[in-house]
Curated annotation (Swiss-Prot):
Entry keyword annotation includes Iron: no
Pathway assigned to this chain's UniProt record: One-carbon metabolism; formaldehyde degradation; formate from formaldehyde (glutathione route): step 1/3
Binding sites annotated in the UniProt record for Zn(2+) 2: 50, 52, 55
Chain residues that bind Zn(2+) 1: 29, 31, 97, 100
Native organism: Xanthomonas axonopodis pv. citri (strain 306)
Gene name of the encoded protein: gfa
Protein role: Catalyzes the condensation of formaldehyde and glutathione to S-hydroxymethylglutathione.
Signal peptide: none
This protein's name: Glutathione-dependent formaldehyde-activating enzyme
Domain CENP-V/GFA: 22-169
Cofactors required: Zn(2+)
Length: 191
């Protein structure tokens, strides 16, 4: 067992599967009062550890843990006025609390994007149990961009594999296939 810390929610092991019939919960920012709350009224999918430099990570974590849910199942229920988009030029518009910096959800506004209609959420911000479990790690090499020395990458990949999170330097094969199929449909090559 390696000593590399990936993320507090997976470092002790990854609980497999989500609770049968689970229908979501409430995400809360980290502010002591006047918390931003977001209701997610569905189970998440494609939960994964993400090493990209844009995703919100708790202090000391090399990766975020993020999943997707249909955007119609995401609703800000308190203190929407505290939310601000982190980077307006990014594909995923990450809505962060201006008080504590936590990203509550990310939304793709480009209707031509393959993942349009899906919002990105960090289920660790919820007290409810039963969310889908992480199943892979994406954008692993990107942690170098946030300060991880390249010589540690073999150990990081070994730890991800040990946790049952296959490491990819892009998305999982199923998600990459979905992106490519979307492009092929737009070109008229698939229907």
């Amino acid at each position: 067992m390696t000593s590399v810390s990936i993320h507090p929610s997976v470092d002790g092991g990854v609980a497999r599967g989500g609770a049968e019939g689970f229908q979501g919960g409430t995400l809360e920012c980290h502010c002591a009062s006047d918390k931003v709350t977001v209701e997610v009224s569905a189970q998440t999918a494609h939960n994964h550890a993400c090493g990209c430099s844009k995703c919100w990570k708790p202090d000391g974590a090399k990766f975020s843990v993020v999943a997707v849910v249909p955007r119609d199942n995401v609703e800000v229920t308190a203190h929407q006025e505290k939310l601000k988009i982190v980077d307006e030029s990014a594909t995923i518009q990450r809505h962060a609390c201006t008080g504590c910096g936590v990203h509550l959800y990310g939304r793709i506004e480009n209707k031509d994007h393959a993942f349009y209609g899906l919002d990105f959420v960090h289920t660790e911000l919820s007290k409810q149990q039963g969310w889908s479990a992480p199943g892979f790690a994406a954008f692993v090499s990107s942690i170098i961009e946030t300060g991880t020395p390249p010589e540690q990458m073999d150990e990081v990949r070994a730890r991800l594999t040990e946790l049952g999170l296959p490491p990819y330097d892009c998305l999982s094969p199923a998600l990459m296939d979905a992106l490519s199929a979307h492009v092929a449909r737009k070109k008229g090559l698939l229907h």
